[in-house]
């Protein structure tokens, strides 16, 4: 009789356990576990063509990372830091896979919240401290959740030269034109240096309402990155000067215009 009673009790309890199990399953379905996006890191760097990394010295580089397909902004920030080790970057041969940046080298560590393989677009604009020289360089690449791109990371190369112009009226009425010309990273141009002054051409064009009325081939002025032309005869005030600097060996070119003071 005792055995029969226990069997009867188990049979009566079974529907109760079944109802509890169904209830738990319903709660689980209604409240699924939330899976957050996994932070994935992308190091972005900007390097001047034939030179070093761009960073704080020239005002930094603004970076925006977007989902190429949806247009959603995934990260925004600034490339800041130093220009890197000159010997490692410019003077020594690089082996394949060799990292040429170091802990002090300018970069932006973009943290991306992605849940699936994502095609991202990286737009970088700079140097922000030299607006006339600033350009935008872009690239797209696939990023995988949890697969960080670090070390040198994604290196975007920036062709160009930074020109800082100055004009001075001499007492005899002639015009002196000065220009400071550097690489996009701010590195100097000097005779016999890594960026040799003989490999660069700097020309000044005097403009009258957009038309060239005089031309001056500028020469190295004795100080790093300084070029000058000191005795240009012009007949009128309210003119402007266009300065053009170019490398004889690379795509690097810089252009800037400035008004001539009275």
Description of each model-found segment:
Residues 142-187, 262:
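Short, compositionally biased P/S/T/A/G/V-rich stretches that sit at domain boundaries
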Residues 84-108, 221-228:
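Aromatic sugar-binding surface patches on proteins
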Residues 110, 131-141, 252-261:
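Edge beta-strands of extracellular beta-sandwich domains
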Residues 55-62, 192-202:
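Short coil-to-beta strand junction motifs in C2/discoidin
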């Amino acid at each position: 009789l005792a055995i029969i009673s226990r069997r009867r009790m188990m049979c009566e309890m079974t529907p109760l356990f079944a109802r509890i199990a169904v209830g738990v399953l319903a709660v689980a379905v209604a409240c699924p576990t939330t899976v957050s996006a996994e932070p994935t890191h992308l190091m972005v760097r900007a390097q001047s063509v034939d030179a070093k990394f761009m960073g704080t010295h020239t005002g930094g580089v603004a970076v925006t990372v977007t989902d190429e397909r949806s247009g959603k902004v995934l990260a925004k920030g600034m490339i800041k830091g130093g220009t890197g080790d000159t010997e490692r970057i410019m003077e020594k041969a690089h082996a394949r896979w060799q990292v040429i940046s170091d802990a002090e080298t300018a970069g932006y560590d973009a943290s991306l919240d992605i849940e699936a393989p994502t095609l991202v677009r990286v737009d970088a604009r700079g140097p922000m401290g030299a607006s006339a020289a600033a350009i935008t360089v872009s690239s797209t690449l696939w990023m995988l959740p949890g697969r960080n791109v670090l070390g040198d990371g994604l290196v975007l190369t920036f062709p160009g030269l930074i020109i800082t112009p100055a004009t001075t009226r001499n007492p005899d009425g002639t015009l002196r034109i000065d220009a400071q010309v550097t690489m996009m990273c701010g590195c100097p141009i000097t005779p016999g240096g890594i960026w040799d002054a003989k490999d660069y051409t700097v020309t000044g064009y005097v403009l009258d309402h957009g038309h060239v009325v005089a031309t001056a081939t500028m020469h190295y002025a004795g100080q790093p990155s300084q070029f000058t032309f000191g005795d240009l005869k012009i007949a009128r005030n309210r003119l402007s000067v266009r300065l053009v600097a170019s490398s004889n060996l690379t795509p690097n070119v810089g252009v800037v215009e400035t008004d001539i003071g009275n």
